[in-house]
A protein has these predicted regions:
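A short, surface-exposed loop/turn module that caps and links secondary-structure elements
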Residues: 28-53, 81
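Enriched for short, Lys/Arg-rich terminal
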Residues: 1-12, 16-23, 38, 54-58, ...
Length: 82
């Protein structure tokens, strides 16, 4: 399993989400760290170098190395690309 790190703003992002959805998002992050499974897509443009994990109506923006996943933001899809 890859180590998971969070940028300082991520806890606030997660607290702003309904608890059930937040738990689903955290489970999806852990599943991806363990297995690589999930709806992941590399981003381009101003977000180039980041990956996006789609979890329901939310998007998890992160970068990945061989042994670490660093979560940058967790946002509702309506706010994700603004």
């Amino acid at each position: 399993m890859k180590a998971i790190r969070f940028y300082p703003n991520v806890p606030a992002d997660v607290r702003a989400i309904e608890q059930k959805a937040a738990m689903t998002i955290l489970e999806a992050i852990h599943r991806y760290a363990e297995t690589g499974a999930g709806r992941v897509k590399p981003l381009s443009g101003e977000f180039e170098g980041l990956l996006r994990l789609r979890v329901g109506n939310h998007r998890v923006f992160f970068e990945e190395t061989a042994d670490t996943i660093t979560i940058h933001r967790v946002l509702d899809r309506k706010e994700a690309y603004r």
